[in-house]
Amino acid sequence: MKLLTSLFLLSLVLCVNSQGWLRDSLDFLNQARLGAGDMWRAYRDMREANFKNSDKYFHARGNYDAAKRGPGGVWAAEVLSDAREFLQGGSSGRGVEDSMADQEANRWGRSGKDPNRYRPKGLDPKY
């Protein structure tokens, strides 16, 4: 009887302590969704701006905006950035050095540092 009571109390404590897992999971997924949207917006803006030497700025800005969403946004930014660089591979014609520079801009933005470090002079202020 004591064993049964102990197991019941232990499971009750574990259940009470785990009540936040669903909310935390849903928050993470929402942050990831919004972060992916931030990444898409930066990509769309980069294509629209079509401004020479601005890609690093948009990499940093997309990652920065996504990371502000929280851990889910950071995760989405990292996954999308890594996937883009992996899929693009050498097809951009710019080589490994450019890919490494893109990843540095990605990390800079994800770490919460100002993406304007990479902003080229003359880029339209709307970006």
From Swiss-Prot:
Compositional bias annotation for Basic and acidic residues: 104-127
Keyword Signal annotated: yes
Keyword Signal: yes
Pfam families for this protein: SAA (PF00277)
Modified residues (Pyrrolidone carboxylic acid): Q19
Region spans: Disordered: 89-127
Keyword annotations: Acute phase, HDL, Pyrrolidone carboxylic acid, Secreted, Signal
An annotated GO cellular component: high-density lipoprotein particle
Signal peptide stretch: 1-18
GO biological process, one term: acute-phase response
Record's subcellular location: Secreted
Tissue: Expressed by the liver; secreted in plasma.
InterPro entries: Serum_amyloid_A, Synovial_Prolif_Regulator
Function field: Major acute phase reactant. Apolipoprotein of the HDL complex.
Family affiliation: Belongs to the SAA family.
Protein name: Serum amyloid A protein
Species for this entry: Notamacropus eugenii
